[in-house]
Each structure stands twice: as structure tokens, then as C-alpha cells.
């Protein structure tokens, strides 16, 4: 499926694949249990959620907030809410860190300051650190 896909399409595909990597381990196949969500946060989002990844209560609080139907599982739709929040926060951080005196639409490092090649529009698959 990855043949000829754009960078954005590959990114979407990656989010789906990572969700499926964790969602098939316990319980319903297409949802994350609390344990699966914790593993995903700690292994896949440890830079974006630095403090939360080390704090089980914080992970539980995030899951509770996302679990809109309160079934103690995160559906893909509920999980995507977290992805949207992280993308939004990273975008805001890029604008906050950007120098305000240059032209074009290249902004400084996103969450965590990734250095060259990690700015807005120049990602090469590297994450941006994030802490709340």
C-alpha cells in the first residue's frame, strides 16, 4: 500500500499501523486496553509525552479523558483525538519557537527542538519531543 504514497499519506498509514500493532494484544482486536495504551505511550510517544510516559496515573488520566464512551477501551476514533491534540500542540510549539523576521513557511523546531530538518514542512520521519 505504500507504493507511491505521499509523505502525509505515509504518516497516516503509520498511525494506523502503530495503533494496530498495540490493539491486537489483549481484548477486542480494534481497540486499546489500558495496558496496551500505556505500552503505546511509553514506547511510541515517549518524546511527545515525556512526563506522562513515566507516570502511570497521568497515562490513566489521558485514557480516561479520551475514552468518550467510558468502556475502558480506546477505539481508533478515540485514539485519533490524542493524535490530533499532539499534532496541534507540536504545530503551536513550532510557531512559538520560530524566528519572526524571515519569509517563507519554514518554522523552527517543533516540540522538543529537533534541530535542522525537523522544522515545519521539513520532517524526515523524526519525532519532536513534547512535555506538558
From Swiss-Prot:
Biased composition (Basic and acidic residues): 92-106
Each Sequence repeat, start to end: 117-124, 125-132
Compositional bias of kind Gly residues: 107-118
Membrane topology term: Peripheral membrane protein
Annotated residues for binding of Ca(2+) 2: 67, 69, 71, 73, 78
Binding positions (Ca(2+) 1): 23, 36
Residues where S-nitrosocysteine is found: 3
Function description: S100A9 is a calcium- and zinc-binding protein which plays a prominent role in the regulation of inflammatory processes and immune response. It can induce neutrophil chemotaxis, adhesion, can increase the bactericidal activity of neutrophils by promoting phagocytosis via activation of SYK, PI3K/AKT, and ERK1/2 and can induce degranulation of neutrophils by a MAPK-dependent mechanism. Predominantly found as calprotectin (S100A8/A9) which has a wide plethora of intra- and extracellular functions.
Protein name, per record: Protein S100-A9
Gene giving rise to this polypeptide: S100A9
Amino acid at each position: 500500500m505504500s507504493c507511491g504514497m505521499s509523505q502525509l499519506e505515509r504518516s497516516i498509514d503509520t498511525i494506523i499501523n502503530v495503533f494496530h500493532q498495540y490493539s491486537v494484544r489483549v481484548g477486542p482486536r480494534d481497540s486499546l486496553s489500558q495496558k496496551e495504551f500505556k505500552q503505546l505511550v511509553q514506547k511510541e510517544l515517549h518524546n511527545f509525552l515525556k512526563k506522562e510516559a513515566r507516570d502511570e496515573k497521568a497515562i490513566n488520566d489521558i485514557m480516561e479523558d479520551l475514552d468518550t464512551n467510558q468502556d475502558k477501551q480506546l477505539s481508533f476514533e478515540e485514539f485519533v483525538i490524542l493524535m490530533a491534540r499532539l499534532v496541534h500542540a507540536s504545530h503551536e510549539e513550532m510557531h512559538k519557537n520560530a524566528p519572526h523576521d524571515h519569509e517563507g513557511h519554514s518554522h523552527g523546531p517543533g516540540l522538543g527542538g529537533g534541530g535542522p530538518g525537523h522544522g515545519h514542512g521539513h520532517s524526515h520521519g523524526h519525532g519532536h519531543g513534547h512535555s506538558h
